[in-house]
UniProtKB/Swiss-Prot annotation:
Keywords: Cytoplasm, Methyltransferase, rRNA processing, S-adenosyl-L-methionine, Transferase. GO terms for molecular function: 23S rRNA (guanine(1835)-N(2))-methyltransferase activity; nucleic acid binding. It catalyses: guanosine(1835) in 23S rRNA + S-adenosyl-L-methionine = N(2)-methylguanosine(1835) in 23S rRNA + S-adenosyl-L-homocysteine + H(+). Disulfide bonds: none annotated. GO terms for cellular component: cytoplasm. InterPro entries: DNA_methylase_N6_adenine_CS, rRNA_m2G-MeTrfase_RlmG, RsmC/RlmG, SAM-dependent_MTases_sf, Small_mtfrase_dom. It comes from the Bacteria. This is Ribosomal RNA large subunit methyltransferase G. Belongs to the methyltransferase superfamily. RlmG family. It is found in: Cytoplasm. It holds the Pfam family MTS. Specifically methylates the guanine in position 1835 (m2G1835) of 23S rRNA. It comes from Alcanivorax borkumensis (strain ATCC 700651 / DSM 11573 / NCIMB 13689 / SK2). It is an enzyme of class 2 (transferase).
């Protein structure tokens, strides 16, 4: 674990959820560039009632919020906002590890900030749709003239960032690069200047689904989900408990409800906007169904056991590509099934999930496959299922 040295002190940060033999750092130079910028311009948080209020967007592991908290008289001078449950949980866990107050002010998307900020620092999100939506959100919730600083690593920055800032904020420019990171600056216009296309609508089966900004499959249902829809359980017993794990817009769980009206489906996602998309879609088309919605790290925090868990695992975690998220969700599913229950998984053929699944389940069978995807049915968790691989 590499110490994070910032203008007001030092933090020991870990990525969350914790995993053994972690090789990825919990901060980068874009975080440090934002903090250095505030310090160089005399915008560090100070003591007293006149300390500036700072709004932080898209803090990845708590590096920004916690560094500012070390400079602040109170954690209440800092408010964080973002779409990711795991990012918010990372900030809390790292706060505890560093002896800081974990009770940071937090506002989820679609909500207004709890306090009027004097300055904003923002990590540029991976999703262009989420970037557009957040820039418009800032234009509608900030007083005119509030300084806004954005940063990201050069290799991840969208080329259209400055034009998007100018469209939604009315101004914006790129600053100097530093250690493969780049800073951008703007001022809040004090009013909404342009509309976004979000939430958008996507046609799936006989439904027209709400899809909020940043949620996977913005324009149309992805090909993996379309293949999975043809291989879902259709004869579940009355009251069967089903989890749509990593539900996105909710289409998989909704298809289960269509075929099994008496099923009880729990929609799970770590994205607040994904879960809001699913909630909106289920309430529109299945208002009488017994449905539940869980914002969290997969199934963590749920005591319920399921007859069937459905999973189309992501192999991107932000800018990181790998199977570590899938492994964690497989581990959770293996301990969350009732006796005789099943995990049904779809994955890209080249990812070789069957090898990992065979270490967690005594029975792993192929239900369907095509040139690109495989659908597996997994039953009978192995004795080692309670010992995570990661």
């Amino acid at each position: 674990m590499t110490p994070f040295h910032h203008p007001w002190g030092e933090l020991c940060l870990q990525r969350w959820p914790r995993r053994r033999n972690e090789t990825l750092q919990a901060w980068d130079n874009a975080d440090l560039y934002l903090l250095n910028t505030l310090a160089e311009r005399g915008q560090a948080l100070g003591n007293g009632d006149n300390a500036p209020k700072t709004l932080v967007l898209n803090d990845q592991q708590g590096a920004l919020c916690l560094a500012l908290q070390q400079a602040a008289a109170s954690a209440l001078d800092i408010e964080s906002s973002g779409d990711s449950y795991t990012a918010a949980a990372a900030a809390r866990a790292n706060a505890v590890d560093n002896g800081l107050d974990p009770n940071l002010l937090f506002c989820w998307p679609l909500d207004a900030p709890k306090q009027s900020p004097d300055q904003v620092i923002m990590r540029v999100p991976k999703s262009i749709a989420l970037l557009q939506w957040q820039l418009q959100w800032l234009s509608g919730h900030l007083p005119k003239g509030v300084p806004i600083w954005l940063a990201g690593m050069d290799k991840h920055l969208p080329r259209q960032l400055v034009p998007l800032m100018q469209r939604y904020l009315g101004n914006g420019r790129a600053e100097y690069g530093w250690k493969k990171a780049r800073l951008f600056s703007a001022q809040a216009p004090g009013r909404v200047l342009a509309d976004t296309d979000y939430p958008c609508r996507v046609d799936a089966l006989q439904w027209r689904l709400t899809v909020h900004a940043g949620v996977f499959a913005q324009q149309q249902l992805d090909i993996g989900a379309r293949f999975f829809l043809d291989h879902l359980p259709e004869a579940l017993h009355t009251g069967a408990k089903v989890a749509d794990l990593g539900c996105g817009n909710g289409v998989i769980g909704m298809a289960v409800l269509k075929a099994n009206p008496a099923a009880r489906v729990t929609f799970c996602d770590e994205s607040w906007l994904a879960l809001e998309s699913a909630r909106d879609n289920v309430s529109r088309y299945f208002s009488d169904a017994e449905s539940h919605f869980h914002l969290g790290d997969g199934l963590a925090g749920l005591e319920q056991r399921f007859d069937c868990i459905l999973l189309n695992p992501p192999f991107h975690d932000g800018y990181v590509v790998g199977d570590h998220v899938a492994r964690r969700l497989f581990n959770q599913a293996a301990t969350a099934l009732v006796p005789g229950g099943e995990l049904r998984v779809i994955g890209n053929r080249h990812l070789g999930y069957h090898k990992v699944l065979a270490r967690r389940f005594t029975s792993v069978t192929v239900l369907a496959s095509n040139a690109k995807f495989v659908v597996w049915r997994c039953q009978g968790p192995t004795p080692s299922a309670s010992n995570p691989l990661d």
